[in-house]
């Protein structure tokens, strides 16, 4: 099903076609390519806002305790500044991970499959033919961005550790590949829906046809609104 290839991240410039492990075969059409938004990855995957808030609370607590114990505002400031520097480095590393994840990831939708090129140091390419995708779910944010979650057939499985962070959170037993943090999710959702339907037998197209499919319900599955 989902064959994958390995390469080192610095070899992306040697790709025969951007975001793909090989040039598309004759007759296969490229419909869409995109990458995650760096800021959304930082906030949603690496939880930068929550971590920053946690660090801020720790700093406030440390300042209050040192000032209470020593009675010196200067000592409290010095003690807190050292901790603040360490916390800033930690937040910077999280931001760097988000940046590298965004820059090394390319999602591709063709008329035959979805291809995910992911990985910072070790690059992996996953080919997901439409015949092996059971359904998909659109998770749209209020700003028009969002995620596309792909549900593979039960017999097909990609290890969660290989997919992360491009996997639906906490679906460990049956990992679901996820096109994350897309800036404008409606376009790839509509293209995915159309391509998936076109790849299905005529009886399946009729079963899931009018009414069940749309930008808000790609690949015949429900639509979840996220903030």
Give the ranges of each region predicted by the language model.
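A membrane-cytosol interface segment of integral membrane proteins
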Residues: 2-6, 142-226
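Residue-level signature of catalytic and energy-coupling elements of molecular machines
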Residues: 32, 114, 188
């Amino acid at each position: 099903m989902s064959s994958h290839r390995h390469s080192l991240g610095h070899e992306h410039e040697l790709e025969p076609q951007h975001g793909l492990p090989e040039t598309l075969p004759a007759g296969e059409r490229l419909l869409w390519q995109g990458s995650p938004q760096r800021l959304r990855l930082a906030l949603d995957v690496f939880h930068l806002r929550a971590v920053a808030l946690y660090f801020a609370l720790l700093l406030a607590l440390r300042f209050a305790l040192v000032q209470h114990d020593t009675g010196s505002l200067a000592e409290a400031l010095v003690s807190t500044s050292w901790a603040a520097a360490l916390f800033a480095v930690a937040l910077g590393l999280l931001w760097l991970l988000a940046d590298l994840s965004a820059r090394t990831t390319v999602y591709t939708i063709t008329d035959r499959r979805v291809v995910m090129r992911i990985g910072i140091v070790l690059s992996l390419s996953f080919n997901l033919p439409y015949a092996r995708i059971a359904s998909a779910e659109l998770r749209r944010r209020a700003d028009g961005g969002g995620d596309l979650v792909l549900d593979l057939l039960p017999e097909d499985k990609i290890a969660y550790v290989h997919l992360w962070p491009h996997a639906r959170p906490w679906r460990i037993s049956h990992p679901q590949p996820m096109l994350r943090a897309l800036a404008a999710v409606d376009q790839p959702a509509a293209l995915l829906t159309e391509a998936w339907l076109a790849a299905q037998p005529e009886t399946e197209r009729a079963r899931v046809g009018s009414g069940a499919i749309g930008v808000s319900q790609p690949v015949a599955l429900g639509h979840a609104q996220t903030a």
